[in-house]
Structures are given as C-alpha cells and as structure tokens.
C-alpha cells in the first residue's frame, strides 16, 4: 500500500480516494462472478429450451385446423417419441464412428508390430518360409560376420552339483525321521532290557541287629526298593522277635557296608552303578569270606558283608558306640577309594 507524502489535509483526501477505489474494485469483482453464474445457468436451460422449441415448432407445422385436447396430447407424445428416436440414432452413429476410429487405430498398431517382427532374425520364421516354397535347390547361406563372432565366444557353463560332496551336515527330513526312528527303537530295546534286569531275582543275606547278629536270607527282585525289602524282613522277623510285632517298616534301617541306605533306593540302582561302601561293595548282596582278612585289600572284590536290619530307636541310643559309630548316611556323590574298618570315634 502506497503512502502519500505531503500536507496532512492532502493526505486525508488521498486516503478517502483509495478507500473508494477499493470499494469500487470489490463491486466489479462481485458483478463479474454473478455474470459468470448466470451464464452457466443459461447454458443449461438453453439445452432443454432447444429441444422444447423444436418439438413445439414441429407440433405447430403438423397441426391444421381445430383438434381436440386428446388428439393434441397424442400428437405431442408421438413427436417427442420420434424426436428421442432420432437423437438416439445420432448418438449410435457417433458411437459407431468412434468404434471404427479405434479399430482403425488398433489395426495400424498391429500392422506396425508385424513390420517390426518381420525385420527380426527369427530362425523359426525362416524355416516356415522355406517349407512354403516349392522344391528348389538348397541355397548355401553364409553367416554374417557378427554371427560368427558370437559363435566363437566361449559359452558360460552352468554350475552343476557334485555328487561326491559330503552333505550329511545339511538338514534332511528323511534322514532325521530315520534317526528318530532308530533312537526310538534303541530306547525301547534298552527299556526292555532294563525291565528284564529289574525282574531278575537275587538272594539277599541280612542280619537283624539288636547288639548281636541274627542272620536270615530273603529273595527279592532287583527292581524292589529298600522299603519293600524291609517290609518282607519284618514279616519274617515278627515270628521270632516280639518287639517287632507293633513296628512298621518306616521304623527300620538297613545298613550295608557301614552306610545307611535310604528307603527309596532300589537294589538295581546299586548294581548298575557298582556303588561302593566304606567296608565293601554295595552291588553284591550275598555273603562270602570277610574281605578284611584278605592280604591284598586294595583290590576290588565282590565279597561283601551281610547287611544289618535294625530299629531306628536302637541306632539313636547306640550311635556313639562301635559299630554304629562308623555308620553314616549314603551319599552317591562321595567316593570311597579304600575300604576301612577303623572306628571313626577313635583317634
């Protein structure tokens, strides 16, 4: 916006003139928009007016004399129907012309494509052209220079697989299924062997200990637990020892090679692991000569002592006296390299 530089009165007058000019400019723009809108409406109305005028003109020219209102309406409908029919025919003709133009354009494209294909060197097309010709003498066709150059270039060989390469490290579904099947068969075979071993019977010699030994023998299966063994011993001992009539198997202890064996272990556990105690092996349950009397006690032998079956209450009263002072709970992680008979309370 420009500012007037001069007297104050002249400046105020200039401002008024500029405002009037802006208002006049806005009125011109408003009138211009209104005229454009009127022109749009008139164009739309003129299309309908042209159709209506043509129908009215034809109705006037075809009507002669006085006619009734029904005849006038019927004639008007006929003229409108005929007019619409003509307009539809004109539209169909225009559509047909457009379709012909499109077909001609497509035909021109096809013709150009065929010309381009005819220029390409296609050996199959050459063979077809030779078959169509009559039997003539074969012509010797010399290859072009660029064709001979391409033929002389070495072709890149495709990479092939070497059948001698070891592929055992690669994943193979069939091999994995075979391995899993073999593992399952071996597992079942091993389980059957273990079940057979656990079902084997062994004689177990034991001694009921109440300060002195009372040797007995029972037959058990390798898969039986120490608790089951104590139950069977208790049934046998109740007939001879009155103090055991009200006792349960939980109140008994089984001491083998100076180790107190827990009730949940089985004889199979000691046999398979070849467990060793403080004074002899735990995997043999029959009784032979005392291994402590053999000169070479450092050599592992299967001779063993009879295990002791006793009341837990007796052990609690006498655990400070030999031989109970040597006894200790069984620990599978502890290794006994040498057998000993020395009392742990004596120095």
Swiss-Prot record:
GO terms for cellular component: nucleus. Residues 77-113 have a biased composition (Basic and acidic residues). It comes from the Eukaryota. Residues 77-142 are annotated as: Disordered. Residues 123-138 have a biased composition (Acidic residues). GO terms for biological process: chromatin organization. PANTHER family: PROTEIN FAM50A, XAP-5 PROTEIN-RELATED. Belongs to the FAM50 family. This is Protein FAM50 homolog.
